[in-house]
Structures are given as structure tokens and as C-alpha cells.
Amino acid sequence: MNKTTSQEILKTNNCLEWLFEKIFKQLVPNKQELYDLPFSEIYSRTFCNSQIHQLIAESLKSTVIEIETYLTDKKFIEKFLFVSVRREYKFRIKKLHVQIMLKEYDKIEFLINSGYKVDFDSLKLACLNGSLDILNLLLKFYQKKLSSELLMYCSEFSHYDIYQLLTTKYNLYPNLSVFYRAVLSDSIEIVEDVSSNISANQQVMENAFKTNHTDIINLLLIRAKKDGTHIDRNLVVYPIMNCNFELLTILSNMNLIDWHVELYYSALLSGSMEMITYLEDKIDKINPDFHKKKILDSSHQSSGKNSLLLEDIIYEIDGKKYFSHTMNYAIQSGSVNVVDYIWSRGYGITVSNFITAIKQGSVEILERLCKWYHLKLPIYLIHYFSTKSYVTNKIAKAKVLIENKLLMINEPVQECIELYKKEETHIKLIEQPTQIVSDSKYDPDYLMQYSMFFIPMKGFKLNHRLITQIRINLQLNYMDSLVELYTRDRNYADKMILLNNLFLFGTIDQIKILYPLLKTKYCPDKPILMEIICKCEITKLCYLKNNRLLDNDVVQSLIPLVIMLENPLINALFSKLTTVNLIDKYIVLSNNVTLIRKWLNESPVIDKNQIKSLFLLDDTKITDSILSKYSVTICKHKEEFLDWCQEEDLLDTRQKIEKKYLK
């Protein structure tokens, strides 16, 4: 973490913080993760993530180093966790917990001495984060009986020193739940201790095989054999996928492998030609010529399966139909060499393989498929590049398909009922709520929630295809196609799609050329305008202003956001459009400490709820200013403020109120 305060390089930047809050909530959708994972994992995923720095820098036309310095500053992180997280998640994260996450020993000691109570979550966080010195400090002030649950957290993340302390000095004993977590670690010392008293069951063994720590798995296998515990032979898929030949040898010597042709799928997922060759040697002995016979692609159609989707996965050789499973597994391996090899063995390619490559493959793999496939792809594949489809390198992949003339997004389409049904089926599949794979979480469409900007207009069906078609053309700057698309006659809903897309994804040069083609004086929807303001896209705002597209009602509706962001450039622009009168409640909501301090110097009239909101900023100067200037209000409601401060974990503020008003 950066110890230089962010204010030395950038003053409080509400635009940056607004963007980061939105992104943080997408990357940490469940607040409980803050209490279930070491903070180092949250930190590397969010505050110290180069992809996030790059995205925000591009959005704000800033430099990556400025964004990185701002987000990795300890002072900012501390404020973000205590102030922003509780606001965004409606969740009270305690001040003591924040300092434990940040491993600030001196601050923790100060807070405890100031009256902050050590609870079970405090101990849990110290165990998760591997802070032995902090745990020792906390244990001095923890009055309740300790629970073996603490062993789960230090075991899972390999903190053997903490495990030793809790089992020896505090006599905590591991149970089966601890065993489940221990085998997820790389600490053989912890696993050895736990397994000496508890027999491994099937779940324990599977957890261990997933982590691929050979020494730990071997230890468990030996003890399982000694205890007579059944070992599932299907566990062999893990060492195959993890390319662990040493573990395969151990399993083979223990006669725990039944070789069969379906294991070849796992070999493909390993991405290793060495493992693929190894499996081929084993399978050929029991199933000669399995490649030539296409055994892996000879699945039978399951009853009740959607025939619309089945058509996308079928290919034909010598009059016989096959299902392109093998190529799909090869694509999921992420290895171009594996994809090349499977193609060389005579396996077919289908539309399904292109969908898999878009979702889980690389640009290079997609280029390979284009080289071998010579049919036009159905237009409904365009939806896998929509704002609701979260994939990596989305626009680069679209470019590959378009420039290889396989996906003709700008050619007229012969509409029919069958195409409509297929298109609707794929849209529903894409929009199904599923767990997003790790890499896809960094798709800007996911992080920035762009799909929220396109909702059906009353009386119209949302034109999904048009939204994605325009967006791709804008981002690839296909101006000839764009000019043609923007000059067509459209209904009102589709015109708004063109307009909103243009201002959300287009450049100012594209706007200057394309907006006049719409032959309208429409203004983008308010959410689009708010996004433009938050990203400080001044040139777009100037275009709207100069073309008189921002009427007074629209401008007035945007003033609260302008006040909250407190950006000098945006303020200057809006001051030319209207008189920006600072509205008290929006100044408070801005959380901009500099603006609020300046505002408080004018001694505005504020009520007790606004005082509470300002206390939540946890800024010493603001707190002291309020206590000095609003003594009548605070004194009148002092009991309420004292209880509220206790509830909100603002004990230092509570102590100041007690000292000043309870003499």
C-alpha cells in the first residue's frame, strides 16, 4: 500500500471515487467477503489491480500512475472501508475491524484503549490475515470463551503460527469443519496435525485434490488407506487437469485409477500436450483409434433437449452426425497448440465452438477457428458481444469475426420465425444469472454496468441487436457503416438507442459526424448524461451545450450530481448554463471533505440528521467544527447522539460529546 497521502498528488477526486465505488461493488458483490477472505486478496482484486487502474484512467482521461497512487493510498483505503463501504452496502463495518484488515497495530491498540470492544469478528479477521502479533493483543481484551471456529480461518490460509498458538496455549481442538478448510491450504504441518485425530471423508479428499498439493494429498491417501476409508476413483480428473504426473504415479501405484475415454476431456482442459499424449497412450490400450472413430463426439441427443441449441453443436462427416464436444474442451484449455492438435485429428468445428471461443477462449484461438471455418455465422452470435455478455477482449474478438467475413453484422438479415426463436433463446441464455468466471469480471461492461443504460421503452420491444451493432461499429470506428445506420428511418425507441449509444460509447469526432444525421434535437437520456458528467467528458457536454440540447429542466435535474462531484471543470461548464446554488443536502451527500469544510465555515443551518451524516465522514476537523458551531442542536439531542455514535462505532466522537456536554 502507498504510504504517501493521495492528497499530495490528487486532491479529493469524487469522480474517481464514484467510479471506483461502482467497480468495487461489482468485484466484491457480497459484503461478507470482507470477513471471509484475507484483505490482501480484496486489495489485489480492487485497490491494487492494474486492470482497474487502466479502466479508470481511460474513463477519466488521467494517467495510470495517478489512479494507482490514489487508490493504493492507505488513508484513502481506510476512509473507503469505513465510510464508503457502509454507505454502498448499508452495512456497518467497524473501525477496529478496518484497522485489523490493514494490520495497523498501533491504531488497533489506540482504539482498544479508547473503548472499542474486541469481538469475535476481530479475532476472526486477525486469523484470516495472519496477524499473530495483533491476535495476541486482541486476545488480552477478549472476555468470552474461544471457539474452535477460529482454527478454520488460520488453517485455510496456512497460518501455522496462529494455529499453534490456538491449539497449544488456548487448547482449541480441530473438528471436521477445520479439516475441510485445512486441506485447502499449503501447510502440511496443519493438515498433519488435524488428520492425526480425524479421518478424512470424501469431501476432505476432494478439497485436497482440487488444491493440487501433492505432499498433502499423498499424506491423506496413506492415512485413508490405513483407516480403510473409501477413495473415489473419479478424483483422478484433478491431477490430469492440473498436469500432476507425480500424483498420477502415486494413484497408479495404489491401484486407484480406472482408465476410460472420458478422461481425455480432462487432459484437454490441462492445456498440456504432454498430458494429452500420456492419456492417449493409456486410452489407446482400451479403445484403439478413439480419435478416428470420434467416440468423444458421438454423444446421443438427450430427450427434452432444446433442438434449437443442438443445431449449433452438430457437424457431419461421411454422412454421420457428431457433436463438437472435443473442440469445445480444447478451446476451454486456452492453448492454441491444443486447438491446433484437435483440428489436426479430424474433429469438426461448429457454431457452438465459436460461442465457446468468444466466452472462454483467446483472440488467437478465435483467429484459428476463422481460418478453418468457411460458413457464415448466424447473426444471433452478435449478442455474445452485448453489454449483458461478460467476456474478455470483447471488441477485439468481434473484430476478428467481422474482418474474417464470418459475422456480417451490417448486412441485411432475412428475418424469419426460426431466426427469431433462436435469437430469443440465445439472449435468454446470456441474460441468465450465473456465477461470472474470474477473468470475465474485468469486462468493462460488467464493471461499469453498461447494460443498465438500455432498458425497454414503454410501448416498444428493446432492440438488442441494434444496441450491440451500433456499439461494435462505434468502438471499431467503422464510419461508412455508421453513416448508413444513422441515416435510416427509425422509430423513436431505435433513434434513442442510436443517440444513447453514440454519447456513451462514441468519440466527440463521431458525435460531430453522426448526430446531425439523426435529424433531431433529442438529448441523451438522463442516466447517459450522468455517466458523461461522472467521467468528466467535457467535450461531449460542450457539444450538447453549444447545440442547445440541454434545456433548463434537464440542467436543473443534473445540478445535485454536479454539486456532489464538485469538479472544477464541470462546475465551470454548468455555471454557464445556469446559476448553481449549493444545496445543503447535496453538499453533505458529496462526502467531499474540502467542500464540506468550506461550506461549514459559512455556518449553514443544518438539522440533526445532516449532523449525523457529517459525523459518519469520520473527519476530525469536520467533527470539531460541528461540535463547536451546532452545540444547541447537539445538546438538545445529546442522549440520541450518544446512543447513535455508539451504534455507528464512532466512539471517539461519542467521547467528545460526553466531554463537552456531560460535564
UniProtKB/Swiss-Prot annotation:
Organism: Acanthamoeba polyphaga mimivirus
PANTHER family, per the entry: ANKYRIN REPEAT-CONTAINING PROTEIN (PTHR46586:SF3)
Keyword Membrane annotated: no
Record protein name field: Putative ankyrin repeat protein R219
UniProt keyword annotation of Repeat present: yes
SUPFAM superfamilies reported for this sequence: Ankyrin repeat (SSF48403)
Gene3D superfamilies in the cross-refs: Ankyrin repeat-containing domain
Sorted UniProt keywords: ANK repeat, Repeat
